[in-house]
């Protein structure tokens, strides 16, 4: 579309005088990122991609760069910058978000245990709604700050497990405990996915719900973090039985009493 490639026979050749590699952002495939600017000097100290900006450089966020702490004074996604100043606030910030998922197209499905597993295209909606200020020594929550950030929608690929009502009834959980159990299983499954798919846990995300309208049942969704999909969730679908069995075994065999980083605690959860 920009006449940067020319076909000769069965090959494509770069036609511009600058190097092709200079047009590729190693930090993000999502286009122009957000520059992080020191307000005292005007110097760009770093950058984040747009997909992560609402969570990392929202107003009031503590941004860590090369061991230094910076407080975000202003975040302007239209101008693609965040203004920061250096500080030692004594706390770190944890973004809080609200997420929903809608199944657009189920492409494959098969039985998996008492329920079934499927994969296909989903629409994700996410909004950062606030953040916690947590003590940098004890991790205790100081307070919660509300934010009014824009809602973002992304269409990508996902794999989802549907747990039938009979299994839910046998557990005899109330809605709160059922939601917590599904959420914990989602975290564990995401943490174990790199065993079955060439990804990092930061390359994927998840949503779990007691009742997803599209399935009519308790559903755990693991999705690619890239718009359009990256093949990670689909690779998980191919190994769903092994993946789900490993998830259950990790939950059953972990020696902790109330959840730990080895099982249900996720470093990236903001729900």
PLM region spans:
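A short, conserved structural fragment
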Residues: 1-11
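Extended Lys/Arg-rich polyanion-binding regions
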Residues: 17-254
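Generic hydrophobic alpha-helical membrane-span motif
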Residues: 185, 263-265
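Short cysteine clusters
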Residues: 254, 259-263
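Iron-sulfur (Fe-S) cluster-binding segments and ferredoxin-like electron-carrier domains
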Residues: 265-271
């Amino acid at each position: 579309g920009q006449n940067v490639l020319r076909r000769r026979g069965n090959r494509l050749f770069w036609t511009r005088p600058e190097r092709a590699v200079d047009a590729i952002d190693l930090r993000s495939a999502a286009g122009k990122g957000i520059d992080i600017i020191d307000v005292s000097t005007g110097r760009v100290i770093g950058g984040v991609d747009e997909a992560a900006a609402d969570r990392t450089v929202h107003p009031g966020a503590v941004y860590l760069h090369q061991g230094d702490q910076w407080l975000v004074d202003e975040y302007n996604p239209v101008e693609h910058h965040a203004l920061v100043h250096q500080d030692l606030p004594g706390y770190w910030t944890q973004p809080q978000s609200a997420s929903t998922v809608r199944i657009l197209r189920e492409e494959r499905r098969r039985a998996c245990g008492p329920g079934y597993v499927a994969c296909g295209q989903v629409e994700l909606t996410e909004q950062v709604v606030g953040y916690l200020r947590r003590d940098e020594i004890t991790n205790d929550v100081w307070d919660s700050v509300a934010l009014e950030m824009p809602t973002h929608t992304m269409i990508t690929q996902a794999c989802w497990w549907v747990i039938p009502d009979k299994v839910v009834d046998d557990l005899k959980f109330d809605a709160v405990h059922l939601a917590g159990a599904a959420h914990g299983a989602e975290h564990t499954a995401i943490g174990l996915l790199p065993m079955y798919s060439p990804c990092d846990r930061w390359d994927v995300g998840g949503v779990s719900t007691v009742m997803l309208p599209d399935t009519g049942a308790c559903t755990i969704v693991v999705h690619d973090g890239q718009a359009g999909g990256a093949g990670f969730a689909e690779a998980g679908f191919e190994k769903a039985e092994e993946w789900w069995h490993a998830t259950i075994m990790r939950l059953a065999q972990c020696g902790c009493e109330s959840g730990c980083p080895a099982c249900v605690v996720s470093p990236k959860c903001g729900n």
